[in-house]
Amino acid sequence: MSIGAEIDSLVPAPPGLNGTAAGYPAKTQKELSNGDFDAHDGLSLAQLTPYDVLTAALPLPAPASSTGFWWRETGPVMSKLLAKANYPLYTHYKYLMLYHTHILPLLGPRPPLENSTHPSPSNAPWRSFLTDDFTPLEPSWNVNGNSEAQSTIRLGIEPIGFEAGAAADPFNQAAVTQFMHSYEATEVGATLTLFEHFRNDMFVGPETYAALRAKIPEGEHTTQSFLAFDLDAGRVTTKAYFFPILMSLKTGQSTTKVVSDSILHLALKSEVWGVQTIAAMSVMEAWIGSYGGAAKTEMISVDCVNEADSRIKIYVRMPHTSLRKVKEAYCLGGRLTDENTKEGLKLLDELWRTVFGIDDEDAELPQNSHRTAGTIFNFELRPGKWFPEPKVYLPVRHYCESDMQIASRLQTFFGRLGWHNMEKDYCKHLEDLFPHHPLSSSTGTHTFLSFSYKKQKGVYMTMYYNLRVYST
């Protein structure tokens, strides 16, 4: 049975004009002996969240011991995010069911609790690079618009196999491949062309496993791939992410060279990615080269859709955190001079100063040696475009005092954009989403804030969250 058919059995029709779902009375009331109705005795559907309904109505996917753990740990937050982003009830159920049915099994085995009642990073079955405590799920909330913000919920995951880290699958490559070739992938509209191209160029074979394990630097991750799902109003968009680090260790080439060669290989064989793609990549390579090795290509992503509609994004991490250096990077050292980039730089200046509370644009943020410290950029390549389009990820996890400080400062920036609902409610939303996180005393719930700008869409921002399954 498809997700659509299942959802119709639970929610017979989309919400009506009065805001209630057709077939769902606001209250089921008990008739009293005098003919009146007791409004307090019956079951109020308004008191049940979609998470509650699906928990009661749907069997857990196999293996239930693991998917049950992930549903309890993550399902409530996913449901709340869909509600706060104002998804219609029917769409809320549709996407929460998709998460329940198709995504939960990808999160892998539940952690062994041993003598503890709460998981910790030390007993994570696989050390996912997706979040700093190895939680393999990172939901995010995108807001964009020239006036009031429009919202989209997204989720990033690292699919984890039950043999991840073992001799048969030491780098956790099997689960993502199996999913992308499954019926479940067709349910989320994923196509394979670009996925297979980059998988073939980035994944490593069994003949190299032993040698690569010996080469991995201390403290380095071995994640090979992520998936992400944009829960748009009309459809799901699937994205695949690949890490070039193992292929870099295998070949002795830089991660930038590994990615560049793969894109060149694609452009030479594709009717879609041609000379413009090669030119855009060369602009990026020239900028990366100007840093003398300090800027490193971290990963690459593609939209798993028709090639003509897809994008290739190259993610680069640099150690610099001064506003001046960040703005220089955003425009690729002056190589991007279009109006979108110029206006984006003005807004980025205001956002950075607001979130980090800095005045001096030459001042670096406090020194931090964590593997995920520094500033990340992605540069987007599109078919037919001669230049990449920039996006920056503000590393708030490492450089702010607390998550509530981040939220409060974001509210200030939202107000300047005219996003008054987010200005008024974002702090309250955060507390409701993560009631058990120490939001006022630590960071770790927000991971990054991304920012880009286009005149047609306005400011385009995403707040990324760590559910902190393995940390308190």
UniProtKB/Swiss-Prot annotation:
It comes from the Eukaryota. Pathway: Secondary metabolite biosynthesis. Dimethylallyl diphosphate binds at R154, K239, Y241, K313, Y315, Y393, Y460, Y464. The record marks G156 as: Required for regioselectivity. 7-dimethylallyltryptophan synthase; part of the gene cluster that mediates the biosynthesis of hexadehydro-astechrome (HAS), a tryptophan-derived iron(III)-complex that acts as a virulence factor in infected mice. The enzyme is specific for dimethylallyl diphosphate (DMAPP) as prenyl donor. NCBIfam families: arom_pren_DMATS. It comes from Aspergillus fumigatus (strain CBS 144.89 / FGSC A1163 / CEA10) (Neosartorya fumigata). CDD domains: PT-DMATS_CymD. The keyword 4Fe-4S does not apply. Keywords: Aminopeptidase, Hydrolase, Protease, Transferase, Virulence. This is 7-dimethylallyltryptophan synthase hasE. Homodimer. The keyword Protease applies. Disruption phenotype: Leads to complete abolishment of hexadehydro-astechrome production and no intermediates or shunt metabolites are observed. It catalyses: L-tryptophan + dimethylallyl diphosphate = 7-(3-methylbut-2-enyl)-L-tryptophan + diphosphate; an N-terminal L-tryptophanyl-L-alpha-aminoacyl-[peptide] + H2O = an N-terminal L-alpha-aminoacyl-[peptide] + L-tryptophan. Induction: The expression of the hexadehydro-astechrome cluster is induced by glucose. Expression is controlled by ambiant iron conditions in a hapX- and steA-dependent manner. It holds the Pfam family Trp_DMAT. One of its GO terms (biological process) is proteolysis. L-tryptophan binds at E138. Its EC number is 2.5.1.80, 3.4.11.17. Belongs to the tryptophan dimethylallyltransferase family. One of its GO terms (molecular function) is tryptophan dimethylallyltransferase activity.
